């Protein structure tokens, strides 16, 4: 997997907690088969502590292209998550550095990472190195 997807999409629908679930993505896919869609953000700890492989069920083959959005601030954990998520067949892995929600802020990810570019750089480096 590369950092930048080789494909060019005319429409990308940003991941939004509480909105871009499987039903919403299905509706958007009816509108456009070529839009880049994303899962809701999933925190790295949720992936690492979930043994049921729940996150490989967030999408279906007919939903593609779909990106998986990770939330976190620990480069090693995010790298491990990226390996797991990559095995599920998502078209892209996206690191959340824009979510302004209180949940993201309390976990030190999302928009609060704008003030920590060194951490973002380390996270992106680890993710791209190992996936």
Where are these regions (language model features)?
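Receiver (REC) domain switch/active-site residues of two-component response regulators
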Residues: 91
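Extreme N-terminal starter segment of soluble prokaryotic enzymes
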Residues: 2-11
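Glycine-rich, proline-tolerant flexible connector loops at the mouths of alpha/beta enzymes
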Residues: 41, 45-47, 97-118
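Mid-sequence acidic-hydrophobic segments that form the walls
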Residues: 84-88, 96, 123-130
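General structural feature for long, well-ordered alpha-helical segments within catalytic domains
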Residues: 12, 24, 77, 81, ...
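Short beta-strand segments
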Residues: 69, 94-98
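Alpha-helix-loop-beta-strand connector modules within alpha/beta enzyme cores
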Residues: 58-67, 110-131
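Glycine-rich, positively charged N-terminal anion/phosphate-binding segment
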Residues: 2-3, 16-88
